[in-house]
Amino acid sequence: MYTIGQVSEMFHLPISTLRYYDKEGLFPEIERVSNIRKFGEKELEALRVIECLKKSGMEIKDIKQFMKWCSEGNKTYPQRRELFLKQKKAVETEIKRLEKTLDMIRFKCWYYEQAIKDGNEDKINEMLPDKLPEEIQPIYNHAHQITIP
């Protein structure tokens, strides 16, 4: 069993966040000894899932719904699976957006390395948009690709 302070350190979360999660009912079976929360393995696993879902962009109200489904047993497996499929898609979309952002940053790093080497941007601008070095062209193309939602 762990105290709220220990769990706070383990997960790098403020104690106030853990208290908030408890207040919201995300640890329904947490033990209390003399009104002090004691976190067991069940709460730690719940916290891992809660943090995963939060990092994926899910709101607390939806996490609460997931936790409610968990407490309702195996009849809610389809809803839980659907929730994770939806979050998986959201994360994959965000990863694609970040990959494009990273390619723009990679291109600009190369761009300014060349500008520093050449003393100006003239040579680079002559190569744009389609005469860049072989290893840079796909990065440039991806970073400058127009995405229609």
What are these regions (language model features)?
Residues 75-149:
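C-terminal regulatory/oligomerization modules of transcriptional regulators
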Residues 32, 73-74:
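A short, mixed-charge helix-start or loop-turn motif at secondary-structure junctions
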Residues 7, 25-26, 44, 71, ...:
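Short linear sequence elements within intrinsically disordered, low-complexity coil regions
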Residues 65-68, 72, 84:
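Long, amphipathic alpha-helical segments that form or neighbor coiled-coils/leucine zippers used
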Residues 26, 58, 74-75, 120:
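Residue-level recognition of short, well-ordered coil/turn positions
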Residues 1-68:
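Basic helix-turn-helix/winged-helix DNA-binding cores
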